[in-house]
């Protein structure tokens, strides 16, 4: 048992460390509900006190975004800076008027809505995110390797 526990690398996409250096800490997580985001951000802030926390969040499902928009805004306000990607639809058709900007409009913290993933990579290349978190249940995980490489090459 001891050998198995020591070899356990954790659960993929649950507070998964993608890069840890003196300058950057990058974590990826599957969080896609306001309570999960709240726990994720609070946990990261506790572990990395004093580091500026930037969250890149991709909402998952139009209906969930509509139903929990206030909760998402409240949870994301716990970060210092937030970048919102477009909603990942999964199995749903778009709901008129439901978009990531709904969350952004309710937030008090510095935030921006990016139209695509390439914009996120450009932003990371131009900034110095001390504690970076990507979160969401959509296809945001397809960005993790590119983000890691962008940070590693700074």
Regions found by a protein language model. Give the residues of each.
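Short glycine-/acidic-enriched loop or helix-start segments at secondary-structure transitions
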Residues: 66, 93-94, 142-146
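C-terminal helical cap/extension that packs against the catalytic core
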Residues: 73-130
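Secondary-structure boundary motif
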Residues: 46-50, 78, 109, 126, ...
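Short glycine-rich anion-binding loops that position phosphate/pyrophosphate groups of nucleotides
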Residues: 32, 59-61, 88-90, 137-140
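Short hydrophobic segments within beta-strands
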Residues: 56, 85, 134-135
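Nucleotide phosphate-binding/pyrophosphate-handling subdomain across enzymes
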Residues: 1-81
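A glycine-rich beta-strand to alpha-helix segment
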Residues: 118-150
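A short, gly/pro- and small-residue-rich
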Residues: 100-107, 146-154
């Amino acid at each position: 048992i001891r050998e198995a526990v020591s070899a356990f690398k954790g659960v993929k996409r649950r507070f998964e460390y993608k890069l840890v250096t003196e300058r950057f800490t990058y974590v990826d997580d599957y969080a896609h509900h306001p309570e999960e985001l709240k726990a994720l951000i609070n946990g990261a802030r506790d572990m990395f006190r004093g580091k500026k926390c930037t969250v890149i969040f991709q909402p998952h499902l139009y209906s969930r975004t509509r139903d929990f928009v206030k909760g998402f805004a409240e949870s994301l306000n716990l970060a210092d800076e937030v970048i919102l990607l477009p909603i990942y639809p999964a199995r749903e058709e778009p709901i008129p008027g439901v978009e990531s900007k709904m969350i952004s409009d309710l937030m008090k913290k510095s935030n921006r809505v990016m139209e695509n993933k390439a914009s996120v990579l450009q932003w990371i290349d131009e900034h110095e995110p001390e504690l970076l978190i990507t979160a969401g249940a959509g296809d945001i995980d397809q960005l993790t390797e590119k983000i890691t490489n962008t940070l590693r090459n700074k």
